[in-house]
Amino acid sequence: IPLTLVFESNWKTEENYLAVQAWLSVEGYHPITFDKFPDVSYLVTYSGSSTLSHNGLSQGYINITFHRDSPFAYGSVVKDSVIIGSKTIHTGDRDEKPAQQFHEIYLKGTEPCLPVVRITKYGVDGDISVHNRRNNTKVLLPKLALGDYFEIDCDLEMIESKSNTIFTIGNLPQMDLRLEIGRNKLLFTGEALIEILYQPIYLQ
């Protein structure tokens, strides 16, 4: 991606040129957006060398080139929050039917998305699940206790936890939830605050 940075006034040639070089020297890929499409970002890294042009009157521009990591662009991260059941502590029958609620997510873009799911457990101990009825994928965390907090990255297949709950061989979580392009009908089961974070992906 070629880019021209224009400095229209108060341009201090050496000082600002060094500042731009320092800004470009960060390692790895980073998001970049443009005014024309402010809700879409590209992951890029600086490549090659920059060239400076100026007229000696505190005005100038720098030509630089960025390298994209993939043919995809990314929309802004969207967060949907859903509370299922009651946030109060229950002392009733643990075998009663768990709370359930439907929630729809409409995914923009051109590619499916593997979301991040955050779960804060309320009520009595029990399973928490998010089931996409469209493609039969889900997140399932079995036998959670009151106050348990988990963050599940379905893309990296990783779980972060702020609780003492331990999953065993016969009690493993499921985390293959996938959002398809368009409408996704999700069934939430169990008492919890559940947050779904997802990012539209666009093939360029």
Language-model regions: role of each:
Residues W23-G28, H54-G56, H67, G85-H90, ...:
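Short, surface-exposed linear patches
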Residues S76-Q204:
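Intrinsically disordered, low-complexity segments enriched in serine, threonine, and glycine
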Residues Y29-Y74:
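Short beta-strand and beta-hairpin "edge-sheet" elements
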Residues P2-E27, P31:
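Compositionally biased, low-complexity regions
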Residues E15-L24, Y61-I62, V78-V82:
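"Short basic amphipathic alpha-helical interaction patches in structured regions
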Residues L5, F34, Y46, R68, ...:
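Hydrophobic side chains in beta-strands
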Residues I1-W11, S58-F72, N184:
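Oligomerization/assembly interface segments of phage tail-like spikes and tubes
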Residues S25, D35-D39, L57-Q59, T110, ...:
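A generic structural signal for short, non-catalytic loop/turn and secondary-structure boundary residues
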